[in-house]
């Protein structure tokens, strides 16, 4: 399971070190794509195959399904870790996530999220206030 939080800095070429714990789980190759809430999602190749299968089941006749599939797949790239443990985050994905320098990696069970440090701090502040309320809404899921 992917979990934990790590901070790294992106270099001038758009490369960033993937935390060793996450590299162990993800493997040497994985998929990086646009995520929700202005972050990036990182999936192992096996998990990505599961997601592709689920996306194939979405009805082509539904506008929201088409839009989500386009959003999710259009920005997706396969990444390979270099000898220094880094990946290159393409400019279109850096722009989507507002990544300029400092990034936060977060393990979220089956995926890693990559956030701009500034965006993550804003998001964290906004959810800290409502964390208890969110937990109450999740009561039906026996968490």
Swiss-Prot record:
Instruction: Report the record's Gene Ontology biological process terms.
Output: negative regulation of DNA-templated transcription initiation
Chief subcellular location: cytoplasm
Q: Which Gene3D superfamilies match?
A: Transcriptional regulator MraZ domain
Q: Which top-rank group of organisms is this from?
A: Bacteria
Give the UniProt subcellular location, in the record's own words: Cytoplasm, Nucleoid
CDD domains, alphabetically?
Answer: MraZ_C (cd16321), MraZ_N (cd16320)
Q: Where is the SpoVT-AbrB domain?
A: 5-47, 76-119
Q: Which Pfam families match?
A: MraZ
User: Which keywords accompany this UniProt record?
Assistant: Cytoplasm, DNA-binding, Repeat, Transcription, Transcription regulation
| Gene Ontology, cellular component aspect | cytoplasm; nucleoid
Citing just one GO molecular function, the answer is:
transcription cis-regulatory region binding
For this protein, the record's HAMAP family field holds:
MraZ (MF_01008)
Q: What is stated as this protein's family in its record?
A: Belongs to the MraZ family.
- What is annotated about its quaternary structure and interactions? Forms oligomers.
Q: What is this protein called?
A: Transcriptional regulator MraZ
Q: Which organism is it from?
A: Caldanaerobacter subterraneus subsp. tengcongensis (strain DSM 15242 / JCM 11007 / NBRC 100824 / MB4)
